[in-house]
Amino acid sequence: IFDRHRELIDEPCASILNDERAKAIIRFKATGFPNRKDEDWLHTDVAKKFATDYGMNLGRVATAIHGTFTCDVPNLNTYHAYIINDSFQAGENKGKQLPQGVMLGSINDIAADSRDLIGPYYNRLATNGDSIVQFNTAFTQDCLVLYIPRNTVVEDTIQIVTLLQANVDMMSNRRLLIILEENSRASLLLCDHSSLQKQTLSTQVTEIFVGRGASLDLYEIEETSGSNTRLGQLFVRQEQDSRFRHSNITLTNGFTRNRVEVSLEGEGAETHINGLAIGDKEQHIDNRTLVDHKVPRCTSNELYKYILDEQSTGVFAGKMLIRPDAQHSVSEQTNRNLCLTSCAHMYAQPQLEIYADDVKCSHGSTVGQLDGNALFYMQQRGIPAEEARHLLMYAFAGEVIDNIQIEALRDRLHILVEKRFRGELNRCKGCSLCKQ
């Protein structure tokens, strides 16, 4: 496909995309798609997901944004933009403006005037990514760019709605590049939706650069359909005294694999990574993390929780790497999981590699069921069995949701998670969910 349609792929794109594309396709052809012989893919068979005859919007046919997909969060002021399939579209922000110097748009527009600004960042973290990253780089035709200059605070949450929308089986290759310069601050909400029951596959590569003293809060919420496959990879580089907080919430999905790699490259950098995955039916949710402590006096904290019902499958593999020069590192990783049926499966692989001697690190993983004694106690006091189950599940999930810093989003997620447990949120209905 690539060789046959190379001219069509290149034509609408900035030269920076085409330059990296040429190198990526060589790396991809050398390895091909991963398979289950690779330990990193042992529990996630991705090769068969690419066997479907997907359409790709190589001709860049525009798709209109409908008001249904505003994805409003009550009581939260946001600045909207969209990625429809894999193309950036500006939102209708009714007179709202981003602070001076902030850029949010398509790399094909921004690179025309600011190639020197984007050049040092695009594909710099993802260059050595796996073959899925190389595939994404080879076929990407657009990239959302968010650039925040030094000493700039973006008060409103920037909300990006990603939507898969087509009348045929569709593949999209999304790309995001986020740059925060020194002492800047922002919060970003990514809402991932699909509005159709066709087979869909999305690869998504996000590169984030958090400059010295800068702070970024990133929230990702997936509400897609059972026919959707999502393969997401997030790369983060942090400089001195920077802070990065990331929460990934999977409410509804089909087949999901997320990988987060954080490189702590400046002393005093701090990262917090949280995840909540709720699965039922035959859903598959795979989360993998790597936090690389390269320098002294950095802090990392991870908390991932899974609630798996029916025949769903969960995978968690988290690695903390403490390099020889990373003395006085503090790192904690926690993974807790509930399997509600004997047919649900959870695979957990916490890892800790320490090559420094003056550090404080811990990690642990548990897999269990709902507390039978607690269920009995609640039923003895008149709470119906199903309601008691929901209350215990809700309390279990609450620890992750409570780590979200934005109050309005935290409140909204409490409601959505409760609906999910009650079976009221069992498939994606588009962003109109957020208005219910």
Task: Please provide the spans of the model-predicted regions.
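N-terminal amphipathic, basic helical "cap/leader" segment at the start of enzyme domains
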Residues: 1-134, 303, 309
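Conserved beta-strand/loop scaffold segments within soluble protein domains that form the structured core
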Residues: 100, 107-376, 380-383, 397-436
